[in-house]
């Protein structure tokens, strides 16, 4: 096989007159009156190859037998295209290759779908034939970008003196939030390893070990319910460092992300990134990961409407809740009664019992609840919401968390539906000053908002033993365009504080020792102050590539039901394998 001289997509006018050897796949073949044209594709793009019997009759005869997706080697000379033959849609569109030789390296069956961008094919079929799906230029470009992003992170961390240190994949099951993927031990029947949800504890132990600056581009595993921006296995840019403040860790993170965006998109991002407290994010946007590319902010109108004779508002306020509104400027004409009813159904998915609304027409409030607003109250409401003719006012009244969840989700929906979002913009945001705990309705108790190793604010440490709901954390999340792309914090580094933390979470001293005894022991041997962050590589690439599903950024992903259609994983294993592990499967009876 002759050595390749160029990639197809690299050829341009500078190569005119040069002899080239190309390897690739036949994208398309056209027979035009004795001439055959082949679009040859490789990872860098497509170039047109011309087979002319006056130049090589033998090559023409072989080209006549090739079909789409055959793998071939072509030797020829680069020529300029005629002015009328230039293809502006191709990067190589000003040149073509006049073929001298062609060798068929392998044939191909007819693919189950066209290997081209924009093809209309189900996700299931794409994943079943993922190796074909990945041939499409748009998919190829995503993984080029992923490589660029990964390389940039690695180069930056190397330059900052971070050590790349691997932590084990077979580790101990510890409660970190989601369910673990468990791996049975053959040597110790009845015992299990867990695949790590993150290297959290182990990277902290590396700080105890004195490495000072650690990073790892690491796979993590969580057995959780899936959605578009989650997968059961995913990749983190994980880092930890000693003796730095959270502001210094944030500055390192910003430097990395600015470099990544510049390398991947050639866009310059200003720093420092804007900062917002958790409370402000929830109050203004109804989300702890707000998309700040557009307005539609939530506004508390409880004081304005508390005396209005509308029972829905009154009862919410009397029961300790609140009334908030979104003013969708100039949007009243966009929404019919039917459309607004549909928005009511939408917010019900987030716990809201309904969605009240008003339109402003000829300086007056119009809508089902307008009758509850006498002239003075109507004026107060319009002033509070800066409402003008043509505006649509949308209200939720309930407990604060339900109002935030429902109006926060509605805000995001309206931002898209009303085309308020600049899809080219990249809006980074730090969300800081988190509560250390959040209340879990299902469990009926407080749980860690991030993880059990997050350092409380120093002034709040005594509250761990008395009123843990009021404890604030030295935690910080990084948000991009409404997606959380990373979470970090300073960590607990003193044993007595970690013990208080476990007690606040409901651990007995015995259960804490059983689960985390090795960490507690390490904290007695001079663990330094430390902190870090984990950034979601898949999610960052998804956003930079303009996709809306993590599957597009992972070479061999799972479906929304955690199945791999390519390999048919998960699958059953043999009785012999189970016996070796001292395991039996229990099958549910079906009617």
From Swiss-Prot:
Free-text function comment from the UniProt entry: Catalyzes the attachment of L-aspartate to tRNA(Asp) in a two-step reaction: L-aspartate is first activated by ATP to form Asp-AMP and then transferred to the acceptor end of tRNA(Asp).
HAMAP family: Asp_tRNA_synth_type1
Residues annotated as binding ATP: 222-224, 231, 484, 536-539
Region feature Aspartate, mapped onto this chain: 200-203
Alphabetized InterPro entries for the sequence: Aa-tRNA-synt_II, aa-tRNA-synth_II, aa-tRNA-synth_II/BPL/LPL, Asp-tRNA-ligase_1, Asp-tRNA-ligase_1_N, Asp/Asn-tRNA-synth_IIb, AspRS_core, GAD-like_sf
SUPFAM superfamilies for the chain: Class II aaRS and biotin synthetases, GAD domain-like, Nucleic acid-binding proteins
Protein name (database record): Aspartate--tRNA ligase
Catalyzed reactions per annotation: tRNA(Asp) + L-aspartate + ATP = L-aspartyl-tRNA(Asp) + AMP + diphosphate
Subcellular location: Cytoplasm
Main localization category: cytoplasm
EC number(s) given by UniProt: 6.1.1.12
């Amino acid at each position: 096989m002759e050595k390749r001289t160029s990639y197809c997509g690299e050829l341009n006018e500078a190569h005119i007159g040069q002899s080239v050897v190309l390897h690739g796949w036949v994208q398309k073949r056209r027979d035009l009156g004795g001439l055959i044209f082949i679009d040859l594709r490789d990872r860098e793009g497509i170039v047109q190859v011309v087979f002319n019997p006056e130049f090589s009759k033998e090559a023409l005869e072989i080209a006549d037998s090739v079909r789409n997706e055959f793998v071939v080697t072509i030797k020829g000379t680069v020529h300029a295209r005629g002015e009328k033959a230039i293809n502006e849609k191709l990067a190589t569109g000003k040149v073509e290759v006049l073929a001298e030789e062609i060798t068929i390296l392998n044939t191909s069956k007819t693919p189950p779908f066209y290997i081209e961008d924009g093809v209309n094919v189900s996700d299931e079929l794409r994943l079943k034939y993922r190796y074909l799906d990945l041939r499409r230029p748009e998919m190829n470009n995503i993984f080029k970008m992923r490589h660029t992003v990964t390389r940039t992170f690695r180069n930056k961390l190397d330059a900052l003196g971070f050590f790349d240190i691997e932590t084990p994949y077979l580790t101990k099951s510890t409660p970190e939030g989601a369910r673990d993927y468990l791996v049975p031990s053959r040597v110790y029947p009845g015992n299990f390893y867990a695949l790590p949800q993150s290297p959290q504890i182990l990277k902290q132990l590396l700080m105890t070990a004195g490495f000072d600056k650690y990073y790892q581009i690491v796979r993590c595993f969580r057995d959780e319910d899936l959605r578009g921006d989650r997968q059961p296995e995913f990749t983190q840019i994980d880092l930890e460092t000693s003796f730095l403040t959270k502001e210094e860790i944030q500055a390192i993170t910003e430097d990395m992300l600015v470099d990544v965006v510049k390398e991947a998109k050639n866009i310059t991002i200003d720093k420092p990134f804007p900062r917002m407290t958790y409370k402000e994010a929830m109050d203004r946007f109804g989300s702890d990961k707000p998309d700040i590319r557009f307005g539609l902010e939530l506004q508390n109108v409880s004081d304005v409407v508390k005396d209005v004779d509308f029972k829905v508002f009154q009862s919410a306020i009397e029961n300790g809740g609140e009334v908030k509104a979104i003013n969708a400027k100039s949007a009243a004409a966009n929404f019919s009664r039917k459309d607004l009813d549909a928005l009511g159904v939408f917010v019900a998915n987030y716990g809201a019992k309904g969605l009240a609304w008003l339109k402003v027409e000829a300086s007056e409030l119009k809508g089902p609840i307008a009758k509850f607003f006498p002239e003075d109250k109507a004026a107060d409401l319009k002033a509070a919401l800066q409402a003008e003719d043509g505006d649509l006012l949308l209200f939720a009244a309930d407990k604060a968390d339900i109002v935030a969840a429902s109006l926060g989700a509605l805000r995001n929906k309206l931002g898209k539906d009303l085309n308020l979002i600049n899809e080219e913009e990249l809006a980074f945001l730090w969300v800081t000053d988190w509560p250390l705990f959040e209340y879990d309705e299902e469990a009926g108790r407080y749980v860690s908002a991030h993880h059990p190793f997050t350092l409380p604010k120093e002034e709040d440490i005594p509250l761990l033993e008395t009123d843990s709901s009021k404890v604030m954390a030295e935690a910080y999340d990084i948000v991009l365009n409404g997606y959380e792309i990373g979470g970090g914090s300073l960590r607990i580094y003193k044993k007595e504080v970690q013990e208080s933390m476990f007690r606040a979470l409901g651990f007995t001293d015995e259960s804490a020792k059983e689960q985390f005894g090795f960490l507690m022991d390490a904290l007695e041997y001079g663990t330094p102050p430390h902190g870090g962050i984990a950034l979601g590589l898949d999610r960052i690439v998804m956003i930079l590539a303009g996709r809306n599903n993590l599957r597009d950024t992972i070479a061999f992903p799972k479906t929304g039901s955690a199945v791999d259609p390519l390999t048919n994983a998960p699958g059953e294993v043999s009785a012999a394998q189970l016996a070796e592990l001292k395991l039996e499967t229990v099958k549910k009876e079906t009617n």
